[in-house]
Amino acid sequence: MEKKVTIINETGLHARPASMFVKKASEFKSSVELIHEGERVNAKSIMGIMKLGLAKGTEITIETKGEDEELALNSMIELVENGFGEKK
């Protein structure tokens, strides 16, 4: 399963939200990947996420595969759409 979402928090996917993303992705048995401009990274790897340099307004695709893929995808989308809990 996959869905495109846009990073909405002011500071983009810097260290704190990236660590939140990894922590959330690691809760699932399914694989979770981020895709940006053709580059695909494991969303359970903070280094992978950080190397993408995702700023506010960047569109990414979240892809999940596995037994809990729907729950994983919905949870990851919710995290991004809520701006990782940062004030807007």
Predicted regions and their residues:
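Compact, glycine-rich, soluble single-domain proteins
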Residues: 6-47, 51-57
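Absolute protein N-terminus
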Residues: 1-3
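C-terminal structural segments of small proteins and small subunits
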Residues: 55-88
